[in-house]
Amino acid sequence: AFSYAETYRYYKTVNIYKFSREFSRHKYVPFLEAYTKAVGNNEYYEQVLRVITLLDKTDLKALPITTEKWYEIDDVQDLDIASALFADQPAERKKQYMRRYGGYWRFPGMLDFCYLVNPYFPSERMRDEMRANFDVLLTEYPSGMYVNSLLAGKCFNVQQHYMAVGNGAAELIKSLMEKAEGRLGVVYPTFEEYPNRIAKERIVAFTPQNRDLSYTVADLQHFFADKQISTLLLINPDNPSGNFISAPDVLLLAEWCRERGITLLLDESFVDFSTDWQTSSLLSDGILEAYPNLIVVKSISKSFGVPGLRLGIMASSNEDLIADIKRDVSIWNINSFAEFFMQIYNKYDKDYKRACEKFQEERARFAKACLLYTSPSPRDKRQS
């Protein structure tokens, strides 16, 4: 009988057959007729061949497929996948892939360099614990925001009432941007989820005029000083440029914003990939309380290696804002697997630190081996 535990041993058949007249007349067709009478018509015809091979020595041969492109189409989903695989023009093929925004396990041969995900976490120990609890997590409702904000606070050592948990950071970004008023300062190029959520005429864009798109706190202060913005978006490290500003300098920017009544929206989704990552985050009660104009957003997809869980957090000492975000999302906005990840994460905190260190080692090795220019360089200490 078929077993998913043994799929590595199975072959997938591309069903193009060539039978001799004698084989068809004396073996295949008689067995096919007997099989349909015994089992019915709504069965796979390959089963007939399987029965024949078990009962009789046959001279059936199979040709292994190597680089040939093929796809079996049984339903509308298969047709959609095949349309992407067999698109004639590269531009059309790219369009077919990009409109999916994920789900690329349907294309096993694809190498995805778009989404930066830590391949060294979760550790095998953590995966084992999640596998062991799969059945109960699959069949039980998750908790609501009260419990999940408590868990997120535990993971990041931040008070529960400063935290909101989202179905990915994207859910929180959508809710926040819909509530934002006034003009938004944005450094381009950027992660488009933020500016896409507000009217274009409300965006004040700053594009660094240099080769590596680098900028400092002083650059931001100089450009936005007279722009009358209500919110300044800082993605740090930036996506996609990689520009990085140290935590002390970000605090200088937070103070500058506070003096001018500007909200600093800080996205730290990639901060754990930075060289000094353990001292680069502003996720702490003390900092949040000192700067009530500061909002920190963090995706749990990237450095934690779990984009499929759809998990993100938002933190601020502006409790009215956090409470408003919590009311805006649905009662069960994350699933049981994402909740359980937060529930057990602290047991594997050391594994996570090792994974981040290993990621940095591999990045350095890769850059050296391929003679790549990285931005920012590990030695690049940008000052304000």
Over which residues does each language-model region extend?
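Conserved core of the sugar-phosphate nucleotidyltransferase
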Residues: 1-39
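PLP-dependent aminotransferase class I/II
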Residues: 12-16, 293-371
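Catalytic donor-sugar/metal-binding loop of nucleotide-sugar-dependent glycosyltransferases
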Residues: 50-63
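N-terminal "arm"/small-domain region of PLP-dependent enzymes with the aminotransferase-like
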Residues: 85-140, 227-228
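Short loop-beta-helix segment that forms the pyridoxal 5′-phosphate
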Residues: 141-142, 153-175
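PLP-dependent aminotransferase-like
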Residues: 178-234
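Active-site pre-lysine segment of PLP-dependent enzymes
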Residues: 215-226, 240-303
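Conserved small/polar residues in nucleotide/adenosyl-binding loops
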Residues: 373-383
